[in-house]
C-alpha cells in the first residue's frame, strides 16, 4: 500500500512576510502539520487543507477569491510523472521537448544532479512552501535525496492564457539557460493545461537551496556599497537578457508550441549551435494586458490582438494593448447593459475607462519617434529585445550549492518588445520627485524635525537607487542609456501605466499620463521626440473634463491613503486578518468584512484623545 507524506508549511512562509508588513500583528503560528495519505485515496478529506489557499483573506468576495487559488492536483499523478521522468533520464544531450500524457518533458535536464542516481526513484514527501501572488509552490522530496519544485498557477485568468504563459515561461527559461548560460532553475517538465497526470497546469523544476537575495536588500541604507551589492548582480543578469536582438515582437515558445505560421521564421539570426537552431520561435505576446482581467473575452478575440508583430512595427504593441483594453471594456459594458454578466458593473465607470482608452488609441502611435535624431541610438532602442518584468531580489536565490551565485526565478509575462518601452525593475523604479542632495536640494533640511527629514530621505534614497541602476545600465549598454531620459519616460508613460492596471479606477492614472504630455507637446514635436509633425495636441480636452478628472484622481488617491488595505485591493495577510477579527477591529456583515473604524480610533486604557 503506497502512502505519501504531505507537509504543509505555508504558515512559516506567511509568518516571515507578515513580519515585514506589520510587527504589531505578528503571529508565531502553529508548527508544520504532517499528513499521511494513501496515494489511491483521491477523496481523502485530510488532503483538503493541503490544496486550500491560506496565506491571506479578502474583505470582499473572500470565498470566491480563495476558491480561485485552490490548487488541487493529483498526488497519484505526481508519482506517475516522476516515474515517467526516470524513463527519460539522459546524458544531457539537448533534444526537443518530449510529449507524454499531456506533459512535455525536457530530457536534457533529467540528470543525476537533478533527480538522483537511483533507477527506482519515488516521492518521499510533498511540502507546501509558498503561496504567492499568482502561484502555489510545493517542494517534492525524492527517495534519491534530491528535491524538486512543483509550481501550480492559480486560476486567475482564462485557461488559454494560463496555457500560453506556461509554454512561454518554460521556453524563456530554456533560452536563458541554453543560449545565454544564465543561472536559472532547470525545468524538467511542464503541463500547460489539465490534461496531464497531475490534472492541473504545472511547471516542475529543480529546487535551488539558499536564501533570497532580498535578505540583503536594504534600500534605505546610507552605505551605497550595500545597496550596490544587490543591484549589481541583477543588472549583470539584465544586461545579458537584453543582449540578443530578435526578429519579431511577441513572446518566446518552443517550436512545437506555436501555430504553423509562426514556425516559418527564426527567432533570431546567427545561431551556430545545431541543437539550438529552430528550437525557439516567437509567438503571441503574454504581456499582462493580454491576459489580466480578460476572462470574459474569447480566445479568438484575444488572438486578434496579441501578436506577434513585425520588427519594423515597434509601436504596434501600444496600439494592440490599447485595442484589447477597449475590446474588453466594451464587452463588459455590453454584458452589463444586457444584464448578462455575473458581476455587478459600474456602467458609468466603464464608459469613462472607454473614453480614456479612446484617447490612448489616438496617442499611442504618436508617443515616440522610431527615427528620431534627437534620441541617441534610436534604432537600437526600438529593436526587439527580451523583457523580464519581475527582476527583483525577491526572485533571486543565493545558491549555497553553487558558490553562492544568484539564481533567478519567475519569468512569467516575459515578452519581446522595443527596449524603449521597458520599465525599470519595480524594486529600483521611482516615479516621484527626485532628490539628489539633501542639503543642497531641500531648503531648510538641516532644521527640519525627524519625521519631515525622513520623508525627504525616502525620496533621496529612492532617487539614489534608481540612479545606481541607470549607472549600471550605462556602463554595460551605453548605447541604450537614452531610456533614462526624463522626456522618454514621460512619453512612454501612458503605455507603461497600462501595464500596472490593477482595478477600474486606475484609468485615472492612464489619463493623467496623457494629460501631462499636453504642456510639452509642442517642444516634443519640434525636437522630433514624438511621432508627429503636428504641434497641436491630438486630444482636445475641455476645462470641465480636466477639472472633473483632477477631482476624481485626487479623491481616488485620498481613498487609497485613508481606506484600510485599499493598496492591496482588500487582501489582508492571514495572521493579521485572524487577529483583527479576534480583536473586533474587523467585523463580518453578510459574508463581507469591514474595519470597525470607531474601535481603531478609540484610545486604549490609560491613553488620552
Swiss-Prot record:
The keyword Signal does not apply. Keywords: Mitochondrion, Transit peptide. Its main location: mitochondrion. GO terms for cellular component: mitochondrion. It is found in: Mitochondrion. InterPro entries: Aminoglycoside_PTrfase (IPR002575), Kinase-like_dom_sf (IPR011009), Mito_inheritance_9 (IPR051035). Residues 1-24 form a transit peptide. Pfam families: APH. Belongs to the AIM9 family. This is Altered inheritance of mitochondria protein 9, mitochondrial. It comes from Meyerozyma guilliermondii (strain ATCC 6260 / CBS 566 / DSM 6381 / JCM 1539 / NBRC 10279 / NRRL Y-324) (Yeast). The gene is AIM9.
Amino acid at each position: 500500500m503506497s502512502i505519501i507524506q504531505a507537509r504543509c508549511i505555508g504558515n512559516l512562509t506567511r509568518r516571515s512576510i507578515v513580519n515585514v508588513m506589520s510587527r504589531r500583528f505578528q503571529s508565531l503560528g502553529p508548527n508544520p502539520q504532517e499528513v499521511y495519505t494513501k496515494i489511491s485515496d483521491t477523496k481523502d478529506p485530510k488532503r483538503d487543507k493541503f490544496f486550500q489557499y491560506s496565506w491571506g483573506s479578502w474583505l470582499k468576495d473572500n470565498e470566491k477569491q480563495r476558491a480561485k487559488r485552490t490548487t488541487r492536483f493529483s498526488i497519484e499523478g505526481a508519482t506517475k510523472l516522476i516515474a515517467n521522468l526516470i524513463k527519460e533520464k539522459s546524458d544531457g544531450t539537448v533534444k526537443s521537448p518530449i510529449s507524454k500524457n499531456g506533459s512535455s518533458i525536457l530530457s536534457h535536464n533529467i540528470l543525476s544532479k537533478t533527480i538522483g542516481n537511483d533507477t527506482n526513484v519515488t516521492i518521499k514527501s510533498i511540502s507546501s512552501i509558498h503561496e504567492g501572488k499568482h502561484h502555489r509552490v510545493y517542494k517534492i522530496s525524492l527517495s534519491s535525496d534530491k528535491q524538486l519544485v512543483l509550481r501550480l498557477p492559480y486560476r486567475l485568468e482564462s485557461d488559454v492564457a494560463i496555457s500560453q504563459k506556461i509554454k512561454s515561461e518554460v521556453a524563456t527559461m530554456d533560452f536563458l539557460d541554453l543560449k545565454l548560460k544564465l543561472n536559472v532553475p532547470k525545468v524538467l517538465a511542464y503541463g500547460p493545461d489539465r490534461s496531464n497526470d497531475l490534472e492541473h497546469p504545472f511547471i516542475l523544476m529543480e529546487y535551488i537551496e539558499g536564501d533570497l537575495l532580498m535578505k540583503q536588500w536594504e534600500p534605505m541604507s546610507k552605505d551605497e556599497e550595500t545597496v550596490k551589492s544587490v543591484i549589481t548582480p541583477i543588472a549583470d543578469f539584465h544586461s545579458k537578457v537584453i543582449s540578443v536582438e530578435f526578429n519579431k515582437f511577441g513572446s518566446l515558445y518552443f517550436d512545437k508550441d506555436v501555430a504553423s505560421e509562426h514556425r516559418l521564421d527564426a527567432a533570431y539570426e546567427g545561431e551556430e549551435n545545431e541543437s539550438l537552431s529552430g528550437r525557439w520561435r516567437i509567438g503571441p505576446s503574454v504581456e499582462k494586458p493580454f491576459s489580466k482581467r480578460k476572462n470574459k473575452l474569447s480566445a479568438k478575440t484575444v488572438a486578434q490582438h496579441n501578436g506577434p508583430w513585425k520588427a519594423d512595427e515597434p509601436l504596434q504593441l501600444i496600439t494592440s494593448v490599447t485595442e484589447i483594453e477597449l475590446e474588453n471594456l466594451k464587452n463588459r459594458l455590453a454584458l452589463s447593459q444586457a444584464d448578462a454578466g455575473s458581476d455587478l458593473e459600474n456602467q458609468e465607470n466603464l464608459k469613462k475607462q472607454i473614453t480614456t482608452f479612446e484617447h490612448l488609441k489616438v496617442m499611442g502611435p504618436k508617443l515616440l519617434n522610431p527615427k528620431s535624431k534627437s534620441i541617441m541610438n534610436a534604432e537600437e532602442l526600438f529593436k526587439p529585445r527580451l523583457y523580464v518584468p519581475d527582476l527583483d531580489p525577491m526572485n533571486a536565490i543565493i545558491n549555497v550549492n553553487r558558490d553562492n551565485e544568484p539564481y533567478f526565478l519567475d519569468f512569467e509575462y516575459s515578452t519581446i518588445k522595443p527596449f524603449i518601452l521597458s520599465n525599470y525593475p519595480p524594486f529600483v523604479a521611482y516615479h516621484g520627485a527626485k532628490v539628489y542632495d539633501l542639503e543642497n536640494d531641500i531648503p531648510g533640511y538641516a532644521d527640519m524635525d525627524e519625521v519631515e527629514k525622513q520623508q525627504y530621505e525616502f525620496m533621496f534614497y529612492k532617487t539614489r537607487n534608481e540612479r545606481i541602476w541607470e549607472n549600471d545600465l550605462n556602463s554595460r549598454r551605453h548605447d541604450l542609456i537614452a531610456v533614462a531620459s526624463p522626456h522618454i519616460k514621460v512619453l512612454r508613460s501612458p503605455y507603461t501605466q497600462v501595464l500596472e492596471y490593477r482595478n477600474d479606477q486606475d484609468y485615472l492614472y492612464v489619463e493623467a499620463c496623457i494629460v501631462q504630455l499636453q504642456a510639452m507637446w509642442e517642444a516634443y514635436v519640434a525636437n522630433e521626440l514624438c511621432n508627429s509633425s503636428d504641434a497641436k495636441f491630438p486630444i482636445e480636452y475641455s476645462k470641465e473634463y480636466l477639472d472633473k478628472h483632477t477631482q476624481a484622481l485626487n479623491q481616488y488617491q485620498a481613498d487609497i491613503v485613508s481606506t484600510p488595505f485599499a493598496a492591496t485591493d482588500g487582501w489582508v495577510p492571514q495572521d493579521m486578518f485572524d487577529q483583527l477579527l479576534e480583536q473586533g477591529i474587523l467585523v463580518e456583515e453578510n459574508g463581507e468584512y469591514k474595519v470597525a473604524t470607531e474601535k481603531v480610533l478609540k484610545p486604549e486604557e490609560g491613553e488620552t484623545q
